[in-house]
Amino acid sequence: MSYPKRWRERERGREREREGEMDGGIEHRFVEVNGIRMHVAEKGQGPAVLFIHGFPELWYSWRHQIVSLAARGYRAVAPDLRGFGDTDAPPDVAAYSIFDIVGDLVALIESLGEDKVFVVGHNWGATVAWNLCVFRPDKVKALVNMSVAFSPRNPVRRPVDSLRAIYGDDLYICRFQEPGEAEADFARLDTAFLIKKFLTYREPAPLLFQKGKVFGGSSNEKIILPSWLTEDDINYFASKFENTGFTGGFNYYRNLNRNWELSAPWTGVQVKVPVKFMVGDLDQSYHFPRTKDYVHKGGFKRDVPFLQDLVVMEGVGHFINQERPNEVSDHIYEFINRFS
């Protein structure tokens, strides 16, 4: 059935009103950037803080930090990255290279009327933020990154090849490589169940998926949500991924080896902006081989010479910004306030 344009616009307006009610009066708009239409959530006036989400997430992952930073005199800006939520999702896998994604954010920064912004990243958003700082440090005042430490380019081995050699084909990153396979596995499960399983995963062990058996291959398991996560939160994430599917997010992983090839000219480049890094001690990313030694024994500081603060939160999993929202907001504010 085709509905009149005026009806569709009215319904979109009502949806935005409902989103505003559930997320603390955050405003929503669309921006044309780098050839795509990007959805942006924002709140507040003052120096701009760009929040970059990960997988399987949305701008909504930063809902607490947006409200907190806006109340403290900052303009909090959180887009849905390309392929996620209400932002366009180009069909071509090649449209999700790190250069495309960083290009989107450079255009977004310029659309804000800012020469430089503070940047906060988590998960894939952290990877994007590291690369933004490598490619365009002139756009970043300071960076707060979470969960995923900087990964200097290995000049001799592609990243997916390295991970497959350690973990085999069942590591989630390896399992996501073949177009269509992960989509078929995810389609067998309820979307809300998938979101719950990802957000509540707190094992320091790597996330492994047997072929055809993502999270055991069944949605029958009853999951009790932690205090920091509500059914409304799950439903918001699930409603968006039910509309878009997960292909956009998978395509980030499918470009890992291609990003390695394209970024050869930046081999050995340091991250030269002020940095604070935060991670939970139960975060699987923190327990990847050699990561702890890299973070704590000089390698991280060598590659990120302006690393100022390193915070390891005890008893905290991967989704640190949602699990400890107030503490994380305080850490962000304290750090960026030094440079405001």
Segments and roles (model prediction):
Residues 23-27, 37-38, 47-48, 72, ...:
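Flexible "cap/lid" subdomain of the alpha/beta-hydrolase fold that forms the substrate-access gate
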Residues 36-88:
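Conserved HGGG/HGGXW glycine-rich cap/lid loop of the alpha/beta-hydrolase fold
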Residues 55, 59-62, 124, 130, ...:
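Signature tryptophan residues that serve as conserved aromatic anchors
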Residues 316-324, 329:
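Catalytic histidine-centered segment of alpha/beta-hydrolase-like enzymes
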